From Swiss-Prot:
Its EC number is 2.6.1.16. It catalyses: D-fructose 6-phosphate + L-glutamine = D-glucosamine 6-phosphate + L-glutamate. PANTHER family: GLUCOSAMINE--FRUCTOSE-6-PHOSPHATE AMINOTRANSFERASE, ISOMERIZING (PTHR10937), GLUTAMINE--FRUCTOSE-6-PHOSPHATE TRANSAMINASE (ISOMERIZING) (PTHR10937:SF0). The active site is at C2, K592. This is Glutamine--fructose-6-phosphate aminotransferase [isomerizing]. It is found in: Cytoplasm. GO terms for molecular function: carbohydrate derivative binding; glutamine-fructose-6-phosphate transaminase (isomerizing) activity. SUPFAM superfamilies: N-terminal nucleophile aminohydrolases (Ntn hydrolases), SIS domain. The gene is glmS.
Length: 597
């Protein structure tokens, strides 16, 4: 959610910090700030809104001498978006930035106020600064005082702090929130994402859970688990928008390539392979898939595939529910955690709970150095590449594709799928990749059609079987970027309540599969049409009662239809949001990586 950058060294700090924050900008934020300590002079700058506002504030500033510095992009959790609530938070002698949530901040704040501390913001983070100031009254050693202050915090945090008494060091603390430190020719760098550090450092350390410490240029070498950056391939790809109007449009168009990357080395001569030892999958009798948001919709879709193809019981559970609902597990259960970032707080905590129960665990994520990838028994990378837009497109499609492949691979290992069926599914996967190539005629038709769907009191997205989770995803995509109300439903559920909302001002986006339950879904569409809903049908089969019809190319399988419909719904959401003049890359109130509960 929030982004952290830190730097110790001689180089000009403003450009380093702003460049780092720019790299983290796609995660979502509502304010930004930085602090520099050099020659006993502490300067703090904070602005609300876009990073460009902070850049303007610093237009005539340069920080050339040796010093320590921190920077932050904030996504509001405690306190409204404002300059006062932006990070860094500071006192006369220190400044700090924080990602996460301090759960006991209210009680700590009350204690500190009773001792005479005055607060300038509504945030939980400012409590940490005053807590350290208070602790230093009784503990003279700065590091010990910092450690003692951190020990009083309950919640999740990644913290960077600078202090006038330690002009060559940064202090850090990490618990359930990512923080990485690296060293390069220009000095020591901190960030909440390795992508920020990759071009700048030769060595790096992913800080251990519950670690607290002090870093300078000299003592970096004393850290545990130092890794060499040259051992890892970070492609220097062009992440500019190019000729596209926004990153979301670019990423929709990139899905054909990202799906090919997802299948690279996993699909050879119509046989499926996976980076999981077959012995690990022996005796698996049940699968639990745990995730949030679009990843949850990918999980729901895969339940149909695991049950149908691998002939194994599967269930998808929201990570936030799994943690507290006391679901019963069994010794032969396989737990699959799914998260684009690999740092989603609820999914990460659910994964830890599954590990504590002794379950076999697999993580599906897009980040090889994420916390989830480090604590799972196995990790499968979706290889979707960077998504700059907050709304998930490439990641969702790659998650579904990889889960589909995993269902076939598992069936292969368990002996529940024939060699012929494996070949059929492999061919269907390749056809589905081709289906994700955007045809200009399709995009142009959807662009023209979108102007009809700007006003009304809401949208129903409906589908059956595997197209029900896809309907949920289509509705979420529209909600996220257009701010229009949309709900996804299993088609047959219309009669159980939702149909009461139907009138001429309600739009229905109907996913009509030729290969699965065509007649049943057609009947559900007719029920809505009879009550005057405006019907937009996505199908290869023409339906006369449709008010609008997005005709898809013929598909050889229902999963190929799935990907064709997914692409069309993404384009429809994009064009509606563009007509409404919304910032589709940075929707309001949303963050790319949700690292707090």
């Amino acid at each position: 959610m929030c982004g952290i950058v830190g730097y110790i060294g001689d180089s000009e700090k403003k450009s380093i910090l702003l460049e780092g924050l720019k790299e983290l900008e796609y995660r979502g934020y509502d304010s930004a700030g930085l602090a520099v300590l050099s020659a006993n002079r502490l300067e703090v700058f904070k602005t609300q809104g876009k990073l460009e506002n902070l850049r303007t504030e610093l237009k005539n500033k340069e920080f050339l001498n040796f010093g320590v510095s921190i920077a932050h992009t904030r996504w509001a959790t405690h306190g409204k978006p404002s300059s006062a609530n932006a990070h860094p938070h500071f006192t006369e002698n220190l400044a700090l930035v924080h990602n996460g949530i301090i759960e006991n901040y209210a009680s700590l704040k009350k204690e500190l106020e009773n001792k005479g501390h005055a607060f300038l913001s509504q945030t939980d983070t400012e409590v940490i600064a005053h807590l350290l100031e208070e602790t230093l009254k009784s503990e003279g050693d700065l590091l010990k005082a910092f450690e003692k202050s951190i020990s009083l915090l309950k919640g999740s945090y990644a913290i960077l702090m600078l202090h006038k008494r330690a002009k060559e060091s940064l202090f850090y603390a990490k618990s359930s929130s990512p923080l990485i430190v690296g060293k390069g020719k220009e000095g020591v760098f901190f960030a909440s994402s390795l992508s920020v550090l990759a071009p700048k450092v030769d060595q790096f350390v992913i800080l251990e859970e519950n670690s607290v410490g002090q870093i300078s240029l000299e003592n970096f070498k004393d850290l545990n688990n130092i890794e060499n950056m040259k051992d890892y391939a970070f492609e220097n790809k062009d992440y500019s928008k190019g000729n596209f109007r926004n990153y979301l449009e670019k990423e929709i168009y990139e899905q054909h390539s990202s799906l090919l990357e997802c299948l690279e080395g996993r699909l050879e001569a119509l046989s499926v392979y996976c980076e999981i030892d077959p012995e690990f999958l022996e005796n698996v009798s049940e699968i639990t898939l745990c995730s949030c948001g679009s990843s949850y919709h990918a999980s729901l879709a895969s339940v149909y595939l695991f049950e149908r193809l691998a002939k194994i019981r599967a269930r998808a559970i929201l990570a936030s529910e799994y943690r507290y609902a006391h679901f019963k597990s069994n010794p032969n259960e396989l737990f699959i955690a799914i998260s684009q970032s690999g740092e989603t707080a609820d999914t990460l905590e659910a994964l830890k709970l599954a590990k504590a129960q002794g379950l076999k665990t697999i993580s599906l994520c897009n980040a090889p150095f994420s916390m989830m990838s480090r604590i799972s028994d196995h990790t499968l990378l979706i290889r979707a590449g960077v998504e700059r837009s907050v709304a998930s497109t490439k990641a969702f499609s790659s998650q579904v594709m990889l889960l589909w492949l995993l269902s076939v691979y598992l069936g292969k290992q368990l002996g529940t799928i024939s060699k012929e069926e494996e070949r059929i599914q492999a061919k269907n996967m390749l056809n589905s990749v081709k289906a994700m190539k955007v045809e200009p005629k399709l995009h142009e038709k959807i662009k023209r059609l979108s102007k009809r769907y700007l006003h009304g009191h809401g949208f129903f997205y409906i589908g059956r079987d595997v197209f029900y989770p896809l309907a949920l995803e289509g509705a979420l995509k529209l909600k996220e970027i257009s701010y229009l109300h949309a709900e996804g439903y299993a088609s047959a559920e219309m009669k159980h309540g939702p149909i009461a909302l139907v009138d001429s001002n309600l739009f229905t986006i109907a996913l009509l599969s030729k290969h699965l339950l065509f007649d049943k879904t057609k009947s559900n569409i007719e029920e809505l049409s009879a009550r005057d809903s405006t019907i937009c049908v996505l199908s290869s089969e023409i339906l006369e009662i449709a008010d609008d019809f997005i005709q898809l190319e013929e598909s050889e399988s229902y999963m190929e239809e799935f990907f064709r419909m997914n692409l069309a719904m993404q384009l429809l959401a994009l064009e509606i949001a563009m007509r409404l003049n919304h910032d589709v890359d940075h929707p309001r109130n949303l963050a790319k990586s949700v690292t707090v509960e």
